[in-house]
Amino acid sequence: VDKLHPLVLNIGLAIHNADWNWKNVSSPFTRLYYVTEGTAQILISGKIQILKANHMYFIPAFTKHSYICNSYFSHYYLHIYEEHQSDNNLLDNWDFPIEIPATELDLALFQRLCAINPHMTLQKSDPTSYDNNYTLMQNLLKNKQRTLSEKVESRGIVYQLLARFLQRAQIKMVLKDNRIEEAIHYIRKHINETIELGVLAEKSGLSKDHFIRLFKKETGDTPLRYIIRKKIEKAQ
């Protein structure tokens, strides 16, 4: 948990009337929703997820999805950006449930997060209006400019909400070899650069062939496939 540094990008209450319809959304931040009234749908991983009142929803960063809303729909939204994610994105190591039942405490936490961050609401629900590099940088700046007490309380609330999903999450892969774990950290940190297989093998103290075999044994992927997948995710 010492490596998890979630930052609040946006928090607020949104009310829609069949006007929450956006296709092929994919963002560098995680979305949490608490549905208060009405219903809507999300198309994610090829499946339709119905959004229901008194439930919370988790959409991981870099996950393509679409929104479908044909009637009244009210929900709290929370956008979380993981600081230092290029080095080691802790949330990326887990498979989270999309839906969990919500409690009165969850609702109170969302409401409190709204109360202490009134300037972090979305001006428009259209993802193209806020899911871009300029707005991301502006939101990160707003986050940094808050008082220390607001930062501490906000992060504490985000930890509590994430913990609710972590209770039902499954670890994606358990790395038994520290050399492969370090290689993955290096890949994430340098994902925007050209990553040479020879460099990874050398840092691990292994030959290329041995490194490839060990990497695949630990992750189920070859180093090249893993790097390509991460570059695609980053580019989306």
Language-model segment annotations:
Residues 1, 21, 140-147, 197, ...:
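A short, mixed-charge helix-start or loop-turn motif at secondary-structure junctions
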Residues 1-55, 61-63, 69-72, 87, ...:
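Generic protein-terminus/edge-of-domain signal
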Residues 181-207, 213-236:
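Terminal helix-turn-helix DNA-binding modules in bacterial transcription factors
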